[in-house]
Structure formats: structure tokens, C-alpha cells
Swiss-Prot record:
A biological-process GO annotation: tRNA wobble position uridine thiolation
A GO molecular-function annotation: tRNA binding
Sites where the protein binds ATP: 22-29, 48, 129
Name of this chain's protein: tRNA-specific 2-thiouridylase MnmA
Keywords: ATP-binding, Cytoplasm, Disulfide bond, Nucleotide-binding, RNA-binding, Transferase, tRNA processing, tRNA-binding
Catalytic activity reported: S-sulfanyl-L-cysteinyl-[protein] + uridine(34) in tRNA + AH2 + ATP = 2-thiouridine(34) in tRNA + L-cysteinyl-[protein] + A + AMP + diphosphate + H(+)
Task of the protein: Catalyzes the 2-thiolation of uridine at the wobble position (U34) of tRNA, leading to the formation of s(2)U34.
Superkingdom of origin: Bacteria
Stretches the record annotates as Interaction with tRNA: 151-153, 306-307
Length: 358
């Protein structure tokens, strides 16, 4: 009879399952690994190299997990991380979009390349320190918000496939950040990375625009700034330095502040408007990943159009298999192409995709 993992309510394939926990050096993955070990699961740890981490982190991790009697494998995925995350990030900016690399990293790296590597080691599942949870029913695997409203991270996992979700384990699913810290203190677990992970982990100590310039030397330079009527009002320093909704760096005096309304990449033109000009009633979403299935017709949902935003009520209509239209109950400010839009029915994640320009 298959073994039930006490941290998730459905059987694993093996009678003696091996769970690989992805460890970064932070407190969340450290506690996740310890909880799995406490549960009686056979646990191994994987630390993946991106090419953008401190050089001494891998060795320090090995020492840390040796104390917990958990073997650590170092997985070099620098090439695939560069092509799937960093290159995606820079290319999106050069298209005038505002990407969310964490969402892509989770689907292509953590639960993509790393999951493949874990399976090559004989692991049945991959665990992380994300604050979210999954359940399984006859229709498939469902993704839910985590217990801590301030830390829950289901938004970042909305691109995971059914196979990926089925092999994912989230030991912190019903814990708050305070409970995680208390567990670490109670068991003497000291992370090697004290800072909270950032949205763009591969940009350290520099501006986003400077990073993009280093990645893509031949980048378009200054160009015109136009207001909403098409009137020329200034010159920008490079479109890769701006995102929709941004106020800083426009430097065009007016009776009220200007905000970035759109980026016209074909003309190398920055379109700006006043705050009231940036509210939109509807947006189109592409490359939608439905969890577990595409809804039929239209339905009322709550939607999050960026991670650090509260969900807002909207009407969701699926168009074909991977497109959708979101009609906001109240027009929303600065809906940025390239960002992830994630749909919720209460605490359940219905799916998510990429916001596209109208």
C-alpha cells in the first residue's frame, strides 16, 4: 500500500518515497526540510546554482544540512536559468513589458529542470518553502492560498502544470511566518541567508536598467516623450528604464505628476499621462494555465495583477484554451503588459497568465 505523506493528503508512487527539498539557504526552505525529516519521509536536499548567488553559499549549505543528516546535491543549472529566466526577463523589457521572473522560474526551473534532476536521483516529489497548499480530487490537483495572508505565495505558482503540482510538496502550507521562525528557533535551525528573497534574485546591488544594459549591450537609447494627446513634451533616457505606472524619471513639469501610460517600442516613444488616465476597465490575458481545467463561460472571480496588490473583483471569460478577458468591477490603475494575472475563487487558484497590451 502506498505511503501517505503526512504533509499532503494523497499517496506517493513509492512505498518508501524520497522527497527532494529545494534549499536556498533561507529560513523557509530550511524549516520545510526539517518538517519533512520529522514526518519520517526519506529526504534529500538540492541546491541549484543560477550563476548569480554568493560563491560560498553551496559549501555552507552542505555543512548546515550535514548537521540535519540530510544529503545535499548541488545542481548546476546556470545555462538553463540564463536562457529560461534571465534572457526571458531582458527580452520582455525590450518588448516594453514588465515581466515577473519568479513565476517563470517556478515553472521552468524549480518545478521544471530541478524536478527532472530530482527524479534522476530517484525522488518521487519536490518540496519547497512556499506558503501555499495543494489538494487532489477526481478533477485533478488544485492549488490554494497559504495560511499566512502576509506571506502566501500561490500567485507565483499559478503557471505550474498538473504534473508539476502533483509532484509538489509544500510543508509550510498551514504555517505563518511567525510559526516558521518559532520552529527554527525551537530546533536550533539557523539559515545562512538572513534576508528575505527578492522578486528579482539575480539583480543584486544594481538598478534593473543597468542589469539589462549589461545583458544586452546594443540597446535603444533616448527617444521622445508624448502626452496622451500625442504632444511632444520631453526626451526619455531609454524605454528599458520605464514600466507602466512608473512616476520616477519622467522629468516633465506639469500641473500634476506624469505616469508612464505605455511604451511604444516601434517608435522608441514613451507615452505618459496623469494618474486618472491610467485606469482601465478590462485587460486581456494570454498563455493562461488553468488549474485544473478551463472554466466554461464567464464567472465572477477575484484577480491579482501584481504580487504586492490586493485581489480585486472581476468577471473572467475564457477565450479558447489559453486566452481570457478580465473585466474589472472597478477600473484598475497601471495594468502592466508582461505581468502575471492570477484568478481566484475564494482561496482556490483557478489559473494565471500573462497580461497583454490591448
Amino acid at each position: 500500500m502506498p505511503l501517505m505523506n503526512p504533509l499532503n493528503p494523497w499517496p506517493l508512487e513509492s512505498s518508501n518515497p524520497l522527497i527532494a527539498v529545494l534549499v536556498s539557504g533561507g529560513i523557509d526552505s530550511l524549516v520545510a526540510a526539517h518538517l519533512l525529516k520529522q514526518s519520517g519521509a526519506d529526504v534529500t536536499a538540492i541546491h541549484f546554482l543560477t550563476g548569480y548567488e554568493p560563491e560560498d553559499r553551496a559549501g555552507r549549505l552542505e555543512k548546515l544540512f550535514t548537521q540535519m543528516d540530510i544529503p545535499v546535491f548541488i545542481f548546476d543549472c546556470r545555462t538553463v536559468f540564463q536562457s529560461n529566466v534571465v534572457d526571458y526577463f531582458t527580452a520582455a523589457y525590450l518588448r516594453g513589458e514588465t515581466p515577473n521572473p519568479c513565476m517563470v522560474c517556478n515553472s521552468r526551473i524549480k518545478f521544471g529542470a530541478c524536478m527532472d534532476y530530482a527524479r534522476s536521483l530517484g525522488a518521487d516529489a519536490v518540496a519547497t518553502g512556499h506558503y501555499c497548499r495543494t489538494t487532489k480530487d477526481p478533477d485533478g490537483v488544485r492549488l490554494w492560498k497559504g495560511a499566512d495572508p502576509a506571506k502566501e505565495q500561490s500567485y507565483f505558482l499559478a503557471f505550474l502544470s498538473q504534473d508539476q503540482l502533483g509532484r509538489a510538496r509544500f510543508p509550510l502550507e498551514r504555517m505563518t511566518k511567525d510559526q516558521v521562525r518559532a520552529h527554527a528557533a525551537r530546533h536550533g535551525l539557523v539559515p545562512i541567508e538572513s534576508k528575505e528573497s527578492q522578486d528579482v534574485c539575480f539583480i543584486r546591488g544594481e538598478e534593473c536598467a543597468d542589469f539589462i544594459e549589461a545583458q544586452v549591450p546594443a540597446i535603444p537609447g533616448p527617444g521622445p516623450i508624448e502626452d496622451m494627446t500625442g504632444r511632444l513634451i520631453g526626451t526619455h533616457s531609454g524605454l528599458h528604464r520605464f514600466t507602466v505606472g512608473q512616476r520616477r524619471g519622467i522629468n516633465c513639469p506639469a500641473e500634476q505628476p506624469y505616469y508612464v501610460a505605455a511604451l511604444d517600442m516601434a517608435r522608441n516613444c514613451l507615452k505618459v499621462g496623469f494618474r486618472q488616465d491610467l485606469f482601465v476597465p478590462v485587460c486581456r490575458v494570454a498563455q493562461v494555465n488553468w488549474i485544473p481545467d478551463r472554466p466554461k463561460g464567464s464567472m465572477n472571480v477575484s484577480v491579482k495583477i501584481r504580487y504586492n496588490q490586493t485581489e480585486v473583483p472581476a468577471r473572467l471569460t475564457a477565450l479558447g484554451e489559453t486566452d481570457a478577458v478580465v473585466e474589472f468591477v472597478t477600473p484598475q490603475f497601471a495594468v502592466a503588459p508582461g505581468q502575471g494575472a492570477v484568478f481566484y475563487d475564494g482561496d482556490a487558484v483557478l489559473g494565471g497568465g500573462i497580461i497583454r497590451a490591448e
